Curated annotation (Swiss-Prot):
Organism: Mycobacterium avium
Cellular compartments annotated: Secreted
Name of the protein this chain belongs to: Alanine and proline-rich secreted protein Apa
Disulfide bond entries: none
Family per similarity comment: Belongs to the Apa family.
Comp. bias regions, Pro residues: 95-131, 302-330
Alphabetical UniProt keywords: Secreted, Signal
GO cellular component terms attached to this protein's record: extracellular region
UniProt-recorded Gene Ontology molecular function terms: extracellular matrix binding
Biased composition (Low complexity): 63-84
Amino acid sequence: MDQVEATSTRRKGLWTTLAITTVSGASAVVIALPETSHADPEVPTPVPPSTATTPHPRRRRIPGQPADNAQAGAPAPAPNGQQRPPRRRRMIPTRAPPPAGAPPNGAPPAAPNGAPPPPVDPNAPPPPPADPNAGRIPNSYVLPAGWVESDASHLDYGSALLSKVTGPPPMPDQPPPVANDTRIVMGRVDQKLYASAEANNAKAAVGLGSDMGEFFMPYPGTRINQDSTPLNGANGSTGSASYYEVKFSDASKPNGQIWTGVIGSANAGNRQRWFVVWLGTSNDPVDKVAAKALAESIQAWTPPPAPPAAPGGPGAPAPGAPGAPAPGAPAAPGVTAPAAPAPAAPGAPAAPGAPAPEPGQAPAVEVSPTPTPTPQQTLSA
């Protein structure tokens, strides 16, 4: 029986050496070649999504804190094993759509028990018309819109001066600003005017307009656009109006305008006439419609009766004295009753020839007319 030596010094065979060399070379070739040199690409397998979070490999978990893979919003465990009260959910209010027929957003809801509006009576009388005398002032004429009364104490003729308002008053207690290129003068036609000699209102208006034009516009020029208009006032009063313009020789002056109206009562026994003179320029023209309405609104103003004297007052007869009539009793036969006070009327203008007054000047002295006026020299149209 042969025994193998533990430390054999026998050389290995040739075939064994070749086999070992071949295996070692094949392994080296396999390791040097890339893995995908002769292989198909590998398709990755999809991984289903997961809500769990993988903890960071280097992050240490602190005792008492929730784990990283805990769901967001989950309540933390109560310390010492105590049960934490349930978390109250927060509800978001939602607005329900308005029901059909509801008022739009922002509109107040109608009162459910509100009374419906009363029906309109088809047989109700129409509202009363506007009072045409609503703007009547104590001088008994209707003031034109946009005009105010001015101080007439400085006028040489007439009893009323109207000015056109151009803006609000500067202070509450001050008069408003007025225009300086237009004005209205009113008064009574009496013996101080040359036109009073004309019984015909149309002729009186033409004559008064000529005199007033020479007075207010004493510059050479030509009269143009002349016309006349009849007037029919209240209480049967009638009259006439005359209008013309003056084209001055000085081209720097705007054309002057003048409207003159004469109107009087129809009572032949106590006839009274008044005049209206409306002055203007081409920059601030005369309103013919308003001028006609102003002249036709003039009425003879009768002042209210004087209050009766108090019994026992100065000048009053003693009660029961002879000859003292009872209150309201007619006068005794043969005794003339005291005459009633004369109605107050606008004053009369003075004669032409005085300088044209301006609103706000000091009172001027009244000038009497000369027997024969000197007409203004104007060119024919």
